[in-house]
Amino acid sequence: MSQMHGTATHEAGLHSGPPPRPGQGREALPLTPARRVALLIGVPTCLALTGFIGFDLVAMVGQGHFHFSHTFAATTRQLNVNAGGGNVVVKVGSGPARLSGEATYSLVRPTITERATADSATLAYPCGFPVGNCGLNATVSVPAGTAVAISSGGGDLTASGLTGHVSLSADGGDLTATGITGDISLQTGGGDLSATLLAGDVTLGTSGGDITATQIDSPRVTVDSGGGDVAIVFTRVPQDVQVSADGGDVTIVVPAGPTTYDVTASADGGNLSDSVPQAATSAHKITASSGGGDVTIEQST
């Protein structure tokens, strides 16, 4: 009995004192310079990301829309429209210039503003928040010969029948232009650009989409593609063609015939084919280059 008692007393001695707290006895990780940097970067980033997601959800819940219609002065000969992020259709119509459609917004309803002079008007739809949907889904109707500068920050832009000075820009969507005559500038930020039946001096550009232009009756054409393919088909002998593509293929098709061209072409990462009649003294010049694709210059069949 005395041995059992002694053993019990010895075990009690081993467990004497207050019970250990969870985690007691573990050493804290040292706060090294690398861990300080990770905390300084990671914590604000996580907080910012959480706040942005929450704000985006609030903006989605707080979305609204309203219909609008606006007629410009009959003397307007130059029309500038910044449609925010909506889809825009531009066409020729009778009567004074007119804009109508549906406006969307998040949280706070913006006001459509107009600044006008004797012969020009500038209309803008300033979106107050960088999240959610905000823009004008609009149709713009202008008299023939009206100079236009139309831009959309995120939607598609479609134009037809315009004449005069025409500048169209779709920062995030596709751009489609048909039957336009004059001094023409068509630009996209990342979408595809499709044009047909253009006449006059033409400038085409995109940061990342493809450019396709057919039935082009233009003496001077300048094209700059940031990453997509370029294809241009002429219905008349061009005077000066300049095409540059950072990474896509380039195809230029000119009318069949005896006309010679002064050609300067390069394909840094692809194949080069230039089968058109050539003469260094020709007044018809073609300059084409691609940073990563093929370059083809040929006559129509």
What are the functions of these language-model segments?
Residues 2-82, 89-93, 132, 300-301:
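Alpha-helical transmembrane segments and their membrane-interface anchoring/capping motifs
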Residues 3, 56-120, 137-149, 156-161, ...:
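Short linear S-[DN]-x-LW-Φ motif typified by the pepsin-like aspartic protease active-site region
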Residues 72, 80-83, 92, 103, ...:
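Hydrophobic residues in beta-strands and at strand termini
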Residues 78-80, 89, 100, 122-124, ...:
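Beta-strand secondary-structure signal
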Residues 85, 94-96, 103-105, 127, ...:
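A mature extracytoplasmic/lumenal domain signature
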Residues 107-109, 133, 258, 281:
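A cross-taxa feature marking solvent-exposed loop/turn segments within ectodomains of secreted
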Residues 124-210, 214:
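Non-cytosolic head/periplasmic domains of membrane-anchored proteins
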Residues 193-301:
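Short, surface-exposed interaction patches in beta-rich subdomains
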